[in-house]
Swiss-Prot record:
EC number(s) stated in the UniProt entry for this protein: 6.1.1.14
Alphabetized UniProt keyword annotations: Aminoacyl-tRNA synthetase, ATP-binding, Cytoplasm, Ligase, Nucleotide-binding, Protein biosynthesis
Protein name: Glycine--tRNA ligase beta subunit
Gene name, Swiss-Prot/TrEMBL: glyS
Gene Ontology terms: biological process: arginyl-tRNA aminoacylation; glycyl-tRNA aminoacylation
Length: 717
C-alpha cells in the first residue's frame, strides 16, 4: 500500500517547539485518519531545527465502501393515512433516496423510519489534501508569529512543503495572504554542509535522502548520536560527561548533523564553586561539563574541559573549539571577578541594598518582604514549639535569605540565587544550618526537584511562599486559567509538599489568617483575601491528592468536603491529617473494606440531615434521652454509641483511622436491626420528641464517621 510524506520546511524553529509539535501530531494525526476510516500500517514523526515531518506508511488508496444507516422522523410523522408527509419527503431528499427505500422499525422510543445509504469511499489523496493544511495550521505553542502578509501564525516562516504520495507529488498549496507555498518533492539539506535543494524520489526514501545531505531527521537518532559522541570524547579526556536531561533535550533540536567538540580552560578557574562553572557551561553556553572519574571523586570534581555539540563542519573542530574556549574563558573570568568582589564583604552587609530592589510596586521592596518573611517564620516557630537555638537560626536564615540577590554574581547569573547565598553565608561565618537554609528555602523549585532537608530551609521556605501568596491575593491578582505570573500555584504546591515531606504539624489556615490581617493593616484600602485563599489552597490540595498521591476524586471530595466549610477548615488546619485520611480511604477501597461500613453510614446520614444535631457532637449522653426509647434496638444503638466515643477520639488523636472503621463495622448489625430488625423503629415518628431522639442517634453515628470523611461524597463501588 502507498506511503505519504509531509515535510514542513521553516526557518530555525525554537528548540522546545520541535518536540511540542511532534507530540501534537502524534496525538492528532492518527485520530484524524481514523475518523476518515483510514488505518495506516505505521506512522513515523521527524523534526529538526528547520523542518517538521511525518511519514505515514501503508495507507489504503481509498476508503472502504460502506453502508450508513440514518434514522429519520417517527413513523406517525413520516406517514399520514399511509402516504408520505412533507417531513418524510424532506428527509429522503436530504439523504438522496426515495420514499420507497425507507423502512419502519420498532425502537425503545416507538416506530421510526430508517434508510440505508451506500457510501462510496473517497480517494485517500483527496482526504489528505483536506487534512494536511489542518495538521499544519492547528499546531499550538508559545511565541507564534505572523509571517508573510496573511493571518497564518507559526513559530517561524514556512519556506517549503514536501507532500509525496509514494513517488508522486500530492498537489497542495498553503496560502497566507499574497504568500503562497506550493508543495513539491524538493527539500533542503544542511544549511552549511549541503545547502542545495534535495529531490526526494519517493516518500519512503525521505530519511535516507536527507542523511546524504547531512541532515538526520530523527530526533531519537540524533539523541543517540550525541550521547555516544559525548561519552566517547569524555573518555578520551579521562573523565565522564555530565549530561543534564534538559540540556540534552534542547541540543537535540538545535542541530541537524551533530558533532561533539571538546574544549578546555585554565585549571585556575576550578577554584570557583562548581555550581558557578556548571551554570556558565550548561545554562549560558549549552556545554556539557566533564568531571573526574574514579571512587576518589566523591565531590564530583570537575575537570578543566567542556564538550559542545556543533552543527557545522566536523572537520573544523579545532576552529570551533577555539571560538568556544574564548567565550567560556571570558565568562569564567567575569565570574571569578564577581566571586572575589562578593566575598570581600559579609553577606549581612548586602541587606541595605535590598531596599533598592522592588518586589512589587504596591508591596514594597525585597527588604520589606524579608521583614514579612521573618515575622511569618516566627509564627511557624511558635506553632512548632521550637527551642531558642532553632528560633535563632531560623531568624538568621530569614534575614539573610534574599541577601545574595544584590551580589554581583547573582545579578549576572540569576539561576544561582540561594546557591551563592549558601556559599557567602559560610564564608561570612554563619552556621551550616543557616547557610543550608538560605539555599533550601527555594526548594522545591519545580515538580521533580529535591525537597529541603533542613528545618531552617523548610520554615523559611514556607514563610516566603505564604507571604507571596497572601500579598498577591490581597492585591486581587488571583491566578487564572491563562495566567499565573507570580507562580502562586507552584508556591502553594510547594507549601503542601514541604509540609507533607517534613511531617510538619502546622496550621496553614492560622498562618493565612494572620498574614491576611497583617496585609489589611498595612493596606487599609484593601479587603482580606482569606476566603479566596481558602478556595485556592483547597483546589491545590485536591489536585495534589489526585495527581501525586493517586487518590480517587470522590475520596478527595470526601476528605475536603464539597462546599463544606467545616471540612475546609479542618483540612487547612492539619495538612498531615487530610493526607492520611485520604490515603486510608483509598486503602480500604482497594481492599473493599469500605463496603462493610458504606451502607450503614450513608443510610444513617441521609436520614440524619432531617434532624438538627450539630455535626461536631459525638457524646450520646448530651443529646439522647433514654426515657423516650420504645424499642430495645434504640437502647442497643445508644450503648454502642457510648462505647464508640473513646475509640473515635483515639483514632482522631493518633490518626489511626483503622480503629474507627473497625468499630463502625462492628456497629453495623446494631444499626441494621434499628432499621429492619424485629425491634425496628419508624424514625420519623409522629411524636416529635421521639423523632428527634431517633434522628439524634443517627446523627451521632454520622458525626463519628465524619471524623474520617463525608461518606455522602463517596461514590458506591
Amino acid at each position: 500500500m502507498p506511503s505519504f510524506l509531509l515535510e514542513v520546511g521553516t526557518e530555525e524553529l525554537p528548540a522546545n517547539f520541535v518536540d511540542e509539535a511532534i507530540a501534537q501530531w502524534q496525538s492528532r494525526i492518527p485520530s484524524s485518519l481514523e475518523e476518515q476510516q483510514l488505518t495506516p500500517e505505521g506512522i513515523e514523526f521527524y523534526g529538526t531545527p528547520r523542518r517538521l515531518a511525518v511519514l505515514i506508511k501503508g495507507l489504503p488508496a481509498k476508503q472502504s465502501d460502506r453502508i450508513e444507516e440514518v434514522k429519520g422522523p417517527a413513523a406517525n410523522v413520516a406517514f399520514k393515512s399511509g402516504k408520505p408527509t412533507k417531513a418524510l419527503e424532506g428527509f429522503v431528499r436530504k439523504q438522496g433516496v426515495t420514499p420507497d427505500e425507507v423502512e419502519i422499525r420498532d425502537t425503545d422510543k416507538g416506530e421510526f423510519v430508517f434508510v440505508q445509504k451506500n457510501i462510496t469511499g473517497r480517494n485517500t489523496t483527496e482526504i489528505l489534501q483536506e487534512l494536511v493544511p489542518q495538521w499544519i495550521t492547528q499546531l499550538e505553542g508559545r511565541r507564534f508569529m505572523r509571517w508573510g502578509d496573511g493571518d497564518l501564525r507559526f513559530p517561524r516562516p514556512i519556506r517549503w512543503l514536501v507532500t509525496l504520495w509514494d513517488q508522486d507529488i500530492l498537489p497542495l498549496e498553503l496560502v497566507n495572504g499574497a504568500t503562497q507555498v506550493k508543495s513539491d518533492r524538493l527539500t533542503y539539506g544542511h544549511r552549511i554542509l549541503a545547502p542545495e535543494s534535495v529531490s526526494i524520489p519517493e516518500a519512503s526514501a525521505y530519511q535516507k535522502s536527507l542523511q546524504q545531505a547531512y541532515v538526520e531527521v530523527s530526533p531519537l537518532q540524533r539523541r543517540q548520536t550525541i550521547e555516544q559522541q559525548i561519552e566517547k570524547v569524555a573518555k578520551q579526556l579521562k573523565g565522564v560527561a555530565v549530561i543534564p536531561p534538559d540540556l540534552l533535550d534542547e541540543v537535540v533540536n538545535l542541530v541537524e548533523y551533530p558533532s561533539a567538540v571538546a574544549g578546555n580552560f585554565e585549571p585556575d578557574f576550578l577554584n570557583l564553586p562548581t555550581e558557578v562553572i556548571t551554570t556558565v557551561m550548561v545554562t549560558h553556553q549549552r556545554y556539557f561539563p566533564v568531571k573526574a572519574t574514579g571512587k576518589t571523586n566523591k565531590n564530583n570534581t570537575l575537570l578543566p574541559y567542556f564538550i559542545t555539540i556543533s552543527n557545522g563542519d566536523p572537520n573544523k573542530g579545532e576552529i570551533i573549539a577555539a571560538g568556544n574556549e574564548r567565550v567560556i574563558r571570558a565568562r569564567l573570568a567575569d565570574a571569578q571577578f564577581f566571586y572575589k568582589a562578593d566575598c570581600d564583604e559579609p553577606l549581612e552587609s548586602y541587606l541595605p541594598q535590598l531596599e533598592t530592589v522592588t518586589f512589587q510596586e504596591q508591596l514594597g521592596t525585597i527588604r520589606d518582604k524579608v521583614d514579612r518573611i521573618m515575622e511569618i517564620s516566627q509564627l511557624i516557630a511558635d506553632q512548632l514549639d521550637l527551642d531558642s537555638g532553632e528560633r535563632s537560626e531560623i531568624e538568621s536564615t530569614a534575614m539573610l535569605c534574599k541577601a545574595d540577590l544584590v551580589t554581583q554574581m547573582v545579578y549576572e547569573f540569576p539561576e544561582l540565587q540561594g546557591v551563592m547565598g549558601q556559599k557567602y553565608a559560610l564564608a561570612s561565618g554563619e552556621s551550616p544550618n543557616v547557610a543550608l537554609g538560605i539555599f533550601e528555602h527555594y526548594l522545591p523549585r519545580g515538580a521533580d526537584d529535591i525537597m529541603p532537608e533542613s528545618l531552617t530551609g523548610q520554615v523559611v521556605g514556607l514563610a516566603d511562599r505564604i507571604d507571596t501568596i497572601v500579598s498577591i491575593f490581597g492585591l486581587g491578582m488571583i491566578p487564572t486559567g491563562s495566567g499565573d505570573p507570580f507562580a502562586l500555584r507552584r508556591a502553594a504546591t510547594g507549601i503542601i509538599k514541604v509540609t507533607w515531606y517534613a511531617e510538619l504539624p502546622i496550621d496553614i489556615l492560622d498562618l493565612l489568617e494572620q498574614s491576611s490581617q497583617d496585609f489589611v493593616t498595612a493596606h487599609p484600602d484593601k479587603t482580606s483575601p482569606i476566603e479566596s485563599l481558602k478556595s485556592f489552597f483547597i483546589q491545590r490540595l485536591s489536585t495534589l491528592l489526585q495527581d501525586d498521591l493517586h487518590i480517587d476524586y470522590d475520596l478527595v471530595n470526601a476528605v475536603l468536603g464539597e462546599n463544606d466549610p467545616e471540612y475546609t477548615e479542618r483540612a487547612l488546619r492539619d495538612l498531615l491529617d487530610v493526607r492520611d485520611r485520604a490515603q486510608f480511604l483509598q486503602s480500604i477501597r482497594n481492599n473493599q473494606k469500605i463496603d462493610e461500613i458504606y451502607e450503614t453510614v450513608n443510610r444513617s446520614a441521609r436520614l440524619a440531615v432531617k434532624g438538627e444535631l450539630d455535626t461536631q457532637e459525638l457524646d450520646p449522653e448530651k443529646v439522647i434521652r433514654p426515657a423516650l426509647f420504645e424499642k430495645s434496638s434504640e437502647e442497643h444503638f445508644y450503648k454502642v454509641l457510648i462505647d464508640l466515643v473513646p475509640t473515635t477520639l483515639t483514632a482522631q488523636r493518633e490518626r489511626n483511622y483503622q480503629l474507627l472503621v473497625d468499630a463502625l463495622g462492628k456497629i453495623a448489625p446494631t444499626v441494621s436491626n434499628f432499621f429492619d430488625g424485629e425491634d425496628s423503629v419508624l424514625v420519623m415518628d409522629e411524636n416529635l420528641e421521639v423523632r428527634e431522639n431517633r434522628l439524634n442517634l443517627l446523627g451521632l453515628l454520622r458525626n463519628h464517621a465524619r471524623v474520617l470523611a463525608d461518606f455522602g461524597a463517596i461514590v458506591k463501588s
